[in-house]
Every structure is written in C-alpha cells, then in structure tokens.
From Swiss-Prot:
Effect caused by changing E326A: No change in KLF4 polyglutamylation
Induction: By interferon-gamma in Stat1-dependent manner.
Protein's name according to its UniProt entry: Krueppel-like factor 4
Region of interest (Interaction with ZNF296), ranges: 386-483
Record cross-link Glycyl lysine isopeptide (Lys-Gly) (interchain with G-Cter in ubiquitin), residues: K32
Annotated region (Interaction with target DNA), positions in chain: 443-474
Keywords in alphabetical order: Activator, Cytoplasm, DNA-binding, Isopeptide bond, Metal-binding, Nucleus, Phosphoprotein, Repeat, Transcription, Transcription regulation, Ubl conjugation, Zinc, Zinc-finger
Source species taxonomy: Eukaryota, Metazoa, Chordata, Craniata, Vertebrata
Gene3D superfamilies: Classic Zinc Finger
Zn-finger segments (C2H2-type): 400-424, 430-454, 460-482
Modification sites for Phosphoserine: S251
C-alpha cells in the first residue's frame, strides 16, 4: 500500500521544480542549438535572463540564479537538507517574488534610460551598499530589489558588435555599453522604452529622440508629466500615438503663469505659448492686471477688440436711468471675468486717474447701460416706429351716409355711397354693347359679370372637379356639395 508523501519527499519535490530563471538563463550553446540565432523569442529570453540575474554586491556575494541552478543540479538529499537552510529560503522567497513581477509592464512604464536618472540611482545604490556592513550575511534580503540588466540590439544576442558599443540598444557610438539600473521605487516615473516587447509597442517615443529638458525659470517647476496611451489603435486614427501633457506651476509673483501644454504624436517638450481664448461679444470685463495698469492694454499683451470699449470716453447724455459699475457687472447678460475686491473701483480709462476721491468721481460723466452696449450685441434695441408708414391698418369710420328718408345707410367711401344712391334714383349709366343686347346696369361690376354670359368666360375653377363658373357666389354654392 502506498504511503502519503512525507515532509522530506515534499521538500525534494519542491526543490526539483525548475524555476523561471533556470529556463531563461540556460547555457548559451544549448539555446543556440534549439533556436535560430536572432529570433525574437531568443532575444526576449536573453533579456529576461539578464533581468533575473542580480549583480553581486559586497553584502550579497552570491548569484541567485547560479546558486539555485547549482542546488537543483546537485538534487537529492543535498537539496532536501539545504531546504532547511534559512539563506536558501530567503533566496527562494526573493526568486518567487521576482517571478510574480510583470517585467514587461514595469520596463515599459519606468524611466530607466535617461542619463541623469541612471546616475542618480547608481549613486544612491552605491552609497547604500557602502554604508551597510559587509558582514551582514546572505540571509538579509534587499529592500528595494535593485538590479541591473543590459539591453542588447537585434541580431544574435551572444555576438557583441564592435562599432556600436557592445551591441546595446539606444547607445551612442562613443559611449561605453552602460547597464540600466532598475529600481522598483521608480515605477511611478514614465519612460517610453525598456525591453523588446516594449520596443515593439511604443517605438515612436524612444529616449534618444527626446531633447534635453529646458531649465525651469526661478519660482517655477514641473508639477507633473502624464503619458496617455490608447489600448486599441487603428491606422490613421488620431489616438494611434500617445499624447503627453506637461504641467508647469507658476511662480508666486505672477511672472511665470501656469502652463498646460498638450502634445500628440511628438516627443514631449515644454511649450512656451498658451492658447488664447477669444473674448465673447457681450463680456464687459477686464482682468485684474488691466485694472491696476495705467494703460488700456490687457494683461495678455493684446489690445481690446471692437467689443471692448474705453469707459472714459465722453458720451452724450440720455434720459435712460444710470447704472453703477457694480450693477453693470452684475447684470444678466454681462459677466465679470474676475470678482472685484471690496473697496476696488473699476478703471475709468486713460483720461482719468485709476483711483479718484468721492468728490472727483461725481464730476465724471455718468455711464449709461445703452451706451456701453456695442451694436449687434446680445440685447436688441427697442423698435422705433417708421415714419410715413403705419404699423397696422387704421380702422376707417363710416362717414358717408345716405340722406334719403328711411334709408340711413353709411359707407366708408364716397364711390360706394354714389352707387347706392343710384338705387334710389334708378340711374343705370353702364350699357352692354353686345349686338342685339340692350342691358343697362347701375354698377360696373354688374356689367362685367353680365358680359361673361356673351363670351363664355368662367374664371372661377373648382379645385375638386372640372367645373368652372363665371360668378364667385356660384362657385361657393358648388363647393358646399363637396363638403
């Protein structure tokens, strides 16, 4: 009957499990025989092997990958016995912690290829190693997990180029092959390169093409730098390249304002210009610097446009009620740009001093609301009645009355009254001149209607059928049938 495994068997099985570093840091000859030289997978494994191999420090005189590989090759009881060693347990915990790291993500988001940062990290690492005692022993685990790795160029990773400084990526011709120190404390910084996978993902932001940053003015400094990267990029899309936003803080004296400079598709650099927004047409306000300055020039260096007008111009007086400067700025359609401090009066213009006593302010001509509004602004002017034209037809009064006894009809036109009088007198001045017809009529419209009988003209056409009529009242009676 098979017995359950004991503690020694479990320790042996745990020790026999190969680690990730042993696969990545195998013999160079066996990798060359199994994989073709210069393959992308070979380069990726070569980079991982360099990243997994810790540099020997004075307080840590061992190589983690080499030590673990030696212990695994020895195997057997020796490995079981060494599992109880605290130094080996500490090394194994460090190795498992390194296996859990997403190295591609860390390398693609760490600023490790700039000379200034590399020199700073190297100096701090050497200072910390020199300050720690050499007799600390191998059981003390590193606190910052700092290790160095070289980045090799394309081609065979085992063959070093002779003219390009050891075949390193992004290395200058005259510079020796540097090793890029990696520190877990620098993950919050941003770098566009670091690794073969990161090079394939973001080749357009290599640090070689980033110009050196310009020195900041006194009182100002870089507050933040953000790299916005889209996860799904399509060819021809405006989001295919990451955009960098640099924010520079302003100085307390106001000489250097806050700069927010967005970039898209190019290397990040500080932009000396700020986008100027257009002033709205109905904004009667100026900035605080313009009020405190002696001239009418604005704080941004531009002259006010046609909608911004000086307040000290002599204007003709009107009968409209005057408005105070506070009521003018707090009106419904005009919004002030900055709130005025208590006790501060608006700048009257170049013709008057910026601050006047109360006795002198009474002599300044009062400003009217309609005078400040430019033509074509938000508030329309009151409509003025046009001369010579009536806005609505005046109702006519019936002034013409029939003087016949018992009639008493009134008309607005004299011609209508004249036609009516013919009914009383029996006068018919309109005669039909058709051959053989002697009809006479008192009104001209009656003669026109009669003449259509001779000609057959029917100008009133029905819209729902093909019938036509010579009189409009006949068409009205016909339309009642369709309804």
């Amino acid at each position: 009957m098979r017995q359950p495994p004991g503690e020694s068997d479990m320790a042996v099985s745990d020790a026999l499990l190969p680690s990730f570093s042993t696969f990545a840091s195998g013999p160079a000859g066996r990798e060359k025989t199994l994989r073709p030289a210069g393959a992308p997978t070979n380069r990726w494994r070569e980079e991982l092997s360099h990243m997994k191999r810790l540099p020997p420090l004075p307080g840590r005189p061992y190589d983690l990958a080499a030590t673990v590989a030696t212990d695994l090759e020895s195997g057997g009881a020796g490995a079981a016995c060494s599992s109880n060693n605290p130094a080996l347990l500490a090394r194994r915990e460090t190795e498992e912690f390194n296996d859990l790291l997403d190295l591609d993500f860390i390398l693609s988001n760490s600023l490790t290829h700039q000379e200034s940062v590399a020199a700073t990290v190297t100096t701090s690492a050497s200072a910390s190693s020199s300050s720690s005692p050499a007799s600390s022993g191998p059981a003390s685990a590193p606190s910052t997990c700092s290790f160095s790795y070289p980045i090799r160029a394309g081609g065979d990773p085992g063959v070093a180029a002779s003219n390009t400084g050891g075949g390193l990526l992004y290395s200058r011709e005259s510079a020796p092959p540097p090793t890029a120190p990696f520190n877990l404390a620098d993950i919050n910084d941003v770098s566009p390169s670091g690794g073969f996978v990161a090079e394939l993902l973001r080749p357009e932001l290599d640090p070689v093409y980033i110009p050196p940053q310009q020195p900041q003015p006194p009182g100002g400094g870089l507050m933040g730098k953000f790299v916005l990267k889209a996860s799904l990029t399509t060819p021809g899309s405006e989001y295919s390249s990451p955009s960098v936003i640099s924010v520079s803080k302003g100085s307390p004296d106001g000489s250097h304002p806050v700069v927010v400079a967005p970039y898209s598709g190019g290397p990040p650099r500080m932009c000396p210009k700020i986008k100027q927004e257009a002033v709205p047409s109905c904004t009667v306000s100026r900035s605080l610097e313009a009020h405190l300055s002696a001239g009418p020039q604005l704080s941004n260096g531009h002259r006010p446009n046609t909608h911004d007008f000086p307040l000290g111009r002599q204007l003709p007086t009107r009968t409209t009620p005057t408005l105070s400067p506070e009521e003018l700025l707090n009106s419904r359609d005009c919004h002030p740009g900055l709130p005025l401090p208590p006790g501060f009066h608006p700048h009257p213009g170049p013709n008057y001093p910026p601050f006047l006593p109360d006795q002198m302010q009474s002599q300044v001509p009062s400003l009217h609301y309609q005078e400040l509004m430019p033509p074509g602004s938000c508030l329309p002017e009151e409509p003025k009645p046009k001369r010579g034209r009536r806005s609505w037809p005046r109702k006519r009064t019936a002034t013409h009355t029939c003087d016949y006894a018992g009639c008493g009809k009134t008309y607005t036109k004299s011609s209508h009254l004249k036609a009516h009088l013919r009914t009383h007198t029996g006068e018919k001045p309109y005669h039909c001149d058709w051959d053989g017809c002697g009809w006479k009529f008192a009104r001209s419209d009656e003669l026109t209607r009669h003449y259509r009988k001779h000609t057959g003209h029917r100008p009133f056409q029905c819209q729902k059928c093909d019938r036509a009529f010579s009189r409009s009242d006949h068409l009205a009676l016909h339309m009642k049938r369709h309804f």
